[in-house]
Amino acid sequence: MQYAFDAYVTAVSFDAAGKAVFALGDGSVRFEDGAAVEAHDGAILAAVPHPSGQGLLSGGDDGRLVWSQAAGPKDIAALPGKWIDAVAASPASGLIAFSAGRELHVRDTADAAFSRSFAHDRTVADLAFEPKGRRLAAATYGGVWLWYARIEAQKPGKLVWAGSHVACAWSPDGKFLVSAMQENQLHGWRVADEKNMRMGGYPTKPKSLAFLSKGNMLATSGANGVVVWPFAGATGPMGKQAAEVGYEEAAMVVKVAGAPALPWVAAGLDDGRVWACDLTGQRVVPLKAEKGASVTALAIAPDAGRVAWGCEDGAAGVAEIDR
């Protein structure tokens, strides 16, 4: 199934029914069945699935956080004059987090009156809930700050490493936290003792991260193929080498998506192509062979049955994986 939207595709995800939902740079949310919602007066800057699995949560340059379902949009929060450019949600706790500049905000889907705000020294670039949804990681300059999402007055835990951290991801067991940096490298920590893990060797910036296979592997962009780090055991990737899958000299992987419980990864390339791979046998399955504008959004269904993608020129699609 192919689409030709009129704007850049900011994000794509699968809802609880297994249907793709696209967030666009013109402020609209598009559903696989053709439904469209005008969610924002401006561009969507970040979007994730709602904790309920129904529809999409999006932050925009209009300062609004919006929950879009096929029936229409619902405003969750508003920060007039600001850009909401990082959003996270936890199905486990029902909490929603979003940031604008140095301010991080938390809301509760079960309690409309609940509100928390946390200040940072520098701009927050990305957010991620730990698996239980109680702690929240905020990637910023100098490291990642950790907050207990429900506690009002607190000092954050700080995982420190010099440089600008632009994306972050928790391992499914909550033992490790990995960040992408402005440099051509990742940095990770074993959270319990703050043990540092340097993960370098990338030819470009690895901006896209995805744990898969029950947390035993971490897939990243930033190279000519998908870079896969081993995370099994108590020490994660420490002292181990990464593998590279689907290497092509003429293209770079810019987006990755992983099936949480299965060894399947999807890759979006800077030349517009998309493929998926079963890492147990390293069999690459082409999903979009036509070249075009760079892939900007990518998602794989939890059962690894389908992949959805979007590109910077508005081209998008959904494909079945021939397993």
Which residue ranges define each predicted feature?
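WD40-repeat beta-propeller superdomains and closely related acidic/aromatic-rich repeat-like regions
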Residues: 1-323
